[in-house]
Amino acid sequence: AKIATVGWCFGGSLSLKASILAGKQAAACVMYYGMPVKDVEQLKLLQTDVLGLFAGKEKFISTQVVAEFDANMKLAGKKLTLKSFDADHGFANPSNPIYDKASTEAAWDMAITYLKSKLK
């Protein structure tokens, strides 16, 4: 069976970790503003590419953290598609005061398009 993972925040980190653990069954991985795995040896185990949707105004998972993730994925020989939105952490949560409708809709469209392409 093919496995696709999607997660937000802590779940975004778990999405990446679950895709690593899924091995050859991993078909797609979407992570919304989750802390990336930093260990290049772990990233080498990925059997799918990753769509990373990040919050450009985020302070904890900063643009530096995202750039390091990009570099580590390249070192691991893995494909990463990154998009950073002009929004803060939690932008896709409608119950959050910093909810950003435009960023949420754009991220959702990217995620759905990616998942459809990977799960044919």
Which role does the model predict for each range below?
Residues 1-8:
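Alpha/beta-hydrolase fold nucleophile elbow
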Residues 12-23, 29:
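Short glycine-enriched nucleophile-adjacent loop
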Residues 34-41:
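Alpha-helical scaffolding within the catalytic cores
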Residues 46, 52-54:
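Short beta-strand/loop motif that positions the catalytic acidic residue
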Residues 57-61:
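Acidic catalytic loop of the alpha/beta-hydrolase fold
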Residues 62-72:
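Short alpha-helix in the alpha/beta-hydrolase fold that links the catalytic acid
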Residues 74-120:
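C-terminal catalytic histidine-bearing segment of alpha/beta-hydrolase fold enzymes
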